[in-house]
Amino acid sequence: EHSIVFAPAGTHRDVRNRTVLGGRGAQAEQVARMVSDGGKIRNSSTLVAETEAVRGFLECDGLMLKPQGRIESVPALDAQVDQAQLSHEASVGMIDDAKLDYLRAFGLGEDNARDLIVQGFLNLEDQRIPESVRATVENLVTAARGAEKM
């Protein structure tokens, strides 16, 4: 399961996911990508292993575009049996000024450079993300950046 959460200024997103691996040999991968453009995001993702020989992976990554925003990401693993393999990765950080400077050196404006970094972070080209979702996310990011200029 892949989720993308975008929070423009003045918004608060509270996302909770719980995946139960209840059948022998079950597998799950949850990937959450969060972008705060001044809004607040709280993400809580849990993998529960209830039976033997299950595997699960959580990935929760957040990108802050403005220091006024906030991202809180809480990954949780609940192995209720001995033979479960569960793991997670999580990161939250500000947009990298060095990356912005690098892209601006090639003639991109700051807004275009930010949009490019966000799109790369979200990995919208991932074939597991439906085309309709990709288009919606791109439109939301563009609209939020446009509203900011008004």
Predicted regions span which residues?
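Conserved beta-strand/loop scaffold segments within soluble protein domains that form the structured core
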Residues: 1-108, 122-124, 128-150
